[in-house]
Amino acid sequence: MYELAKKEYGKYGIDTEAAIASLRDIPISIHCWQGDDVTGLDGGESLSGGIQTTGNYPGRARNFEELKADIKKAFSLMPGKKRLNLHASYAVGAEVDRDKYEPKHFAEWVKFAKEIGLQGIDFNPTMFSHKNVKDGLTLSSPDENIRKFWIDHCIACLHIAEYFADEFKSPCLVNIWIPDGFKDVPADRLTPRLRLKDSLDKILACGYDRKKVTVAVESKVFGIGVESYTVGSNEFYQNYAAKNNICCLLDNGHYHPLEYVSDKIPALLAFYDTVALHVTRGVRWDSDHVVLFEDELKEIAKEIVRNNATEKVKIGLDYFDASINRLSAWVTGQGAMQKALLFSLLCNHAELRSLQDMSDFTALMVKQEEYKTLPFGAVWKEYLRRENLSEDYLTEIRKYEKEVLKERN
């Protein structure tokens, strides 16, 4: 089937071998928190910050060893290059608070990531599920002691990220997201943002190595309990990032449902050297459903591929579903992202761009529709074969569920 597909794509000037080779070189940063419903390992408080997991599927990882085992199994069923995306709340054996975290609290993660052949580790300060989230505020808090705690936490995370970069000889992306906002109409929208700006200034002034660490800031339109006002808005962060030469991270669940991250990516590529993504699937709101191979995901992948931005755009996944097998959630979402990238790589973007520039929109529409029915599935299966994987990952996951996950309950 693959040879027939190869010939069919060749009629359109598309090299399937080149597409497969390119796909194998695009790393995806896979989030650890799907495995334990964002619980973390540092004994933090119940989930807060407008974040919610729903469901009670058996087998949730309850400790570091179980989470490692689940990640190892799930990652073994995923094709392509992989990185691990960690939240700071996954510190191992830390007997200090989050503002005092050090590289040693993540040394076991480094050891594990190397053992399973990962390309690197990305990192996130954890500014939720903690007693120092006071009145829903962290880096924008009017309480200077609270604000200093979270500034120190972020600075600690930057130094931990330098450690990751040294260990893997690969830059570490550090994404700063805060839950700060108000449930109802605020009396002052400016001052909290000025406090956030001052906090970020202090964090960036800590002397971290910009060659090793890429700092990103992530906006959100609203969250549960912060429906009326979000301090870290899109406009605030895009201006701050541009002025301070850092990176914007786009989470496609963090915007109005009629806003599309696929349209935002090329807008930022016109000005930024690096754009970061948290790919999720929002259903009516930022519900963080498992990523599926659907239209907007394809459009996101197209903007990465056709703009030659596979090295500029840092792809990470961010979703958590506790209603289904968590390993299946991991593998399905990562596979969907890879499928979307391959689908875009199997497209003659130069031809389509030429039709657009000639204003031949009739031919453009026809060609775009033709691509949808080309034998993509045969190329995907060949890619999996070369990665020594099968399309049927569910059988392996069911076996692991029976032998390992059900024993946890």
Could you tell me what each predicted segment is?
Residues 153-155:
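A structural/positional concept
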Residues 185-296:
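Acidic/histidine-rich catalytic cores of soluble enzymes
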Residues 75, 162, 200-204:
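Surface-exposed amphipathic alpha-helices with a cationic face
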Residues 88, 178-180, 219, 252:
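Short glycine-centered, acidic/aromatic-flanked micro-motifs in structured strand/loop junctions
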Residues 165-166, 171-185:
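Aromatic- and glycine-enriched pocket-lining scaffold segments that form the walls
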Residues 1-142, 149, 158-160, 166, ...:
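Alpha/beta catalytic barrel-like cores
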